[in-house]
Curated annotation (Swiss-Prot):
Pfam family, one: Ribosomal_L32p
InterPro entries: Ribosomal_bL32 (IPR002677), Ribosomal_bL32_bact (IPR044957), Ribosomal_zn-bd (IPR011332)
Organism: Borreliella burgdorferi (strain ATCC 35210 / DSM 4680 / CIP 102532 / B31) (Borrelia burgdorferi)
Keyword Oxidoreductase on entry: no
Family as reported in the entry's similarity comment: Belongs to the bacterial ribosomal protein bL32 family.
Entry protein name: Large ribosomal subunit protein bL32
GO (cellular component) term, any one: large ribosomal subunit
Chain ranges passing through the membrane: none
Amino acid sequence: MAVPKFKPSKSRSRTRRSINMRKKIPQFQECSNCGNLGVRHRICLKCGYYRNNQYLEIGL
């Protein structure tokens, strides 16, 4: 049966556990033009803008 030869250091243990403590990145971002919530790095489906440039003509 496998048994650890040495006690793992605090640094190694905490590094392994740190992945669970990482900050979550928000999946949605507010549109700079209309304020609608949408997927990041995509054209806004409500107004057709992305990075203050209009890419889609959306009839209101």
